[in-house]
């Protein structure tokens, strides 16, 4: 455990001042594609906390595939807060050891999701395979890079967006299952998380299209430059609502509840929402969203819960061992 803990952490904190009081350090266990957001958000919160409380606070980060991160917390990684990309991964903390209460999503606004995102296609410059919408991904010879839906919320949103496309265009569940099965036959390798999938596509130059969240497109541009890819918005996307929660059993043991709760609440502040928009996450605050309207194309979103039922049902039907995904997917 000690080895896992030290290997997982990326310090994002300010150095502790000699004379100033220090607050209890916080560990935020998060998913792959949020690295850049929290690199900007954490110093902003540290400045706010110092102004409010007169204390320095160290914030440590752990990133990885969403479900793998949740499993690490269940197995003992002492996260004060968990910031995942879908509710199932926080539900798992409630179901395994009662690390959070079952009603965790009601404790903050917007079902505890401070921003939203869309699923997009990252294609090679010039879009040589003419990939514009979900059916295009099924063309002969098209290789689709997407992370594993069983370990990555990013992958689950891709799966559900493709399924929802069929339903919104008059297909039934059987047609949707067939469509998504064909889509995953186009996948050359299933990485465990969104950042690994980006490396496969951009660095290793595998695949014709990377399916990911729209904020990852901006992260790719910052890391690799804008010259090698284009962003395509498909006609339909599940609305990604990445939730956050205080891990009650950890903060009670560490005495860090006040800091942890303030850290998450500040995500809804004007500064937190502006940082979200700067990182291509759609802010909940409508005034701030309007200020950044040029970077957020209108998308035909559908709600996962209204289309598929609650996330626990989605997980049980589609993504558990032996679920629908296992039925339709076989490695190439």
UniProtKB/Swiss-Prot annotation:
This is Thiosulfate-binding protein. Binds thiosulfate specifically and with high affinity. Has no detectable affinity for sulfate. One of its GO terms (cellular component) is extracellular space. Pfam families: SBP_bac_11. Belongs to the prokaryotic sulfate-binding protein family. Its main location: periplasm. The keyword Cytoplasm does not apply. It comes from the Bacteria. It comes from Pseudomonas aeruginosa (strain ATCC 15692 / DSM 22644 / CIP 104116 / JCM 14847 / LMG 12228 / 1C / PRS 101 / PAO1).
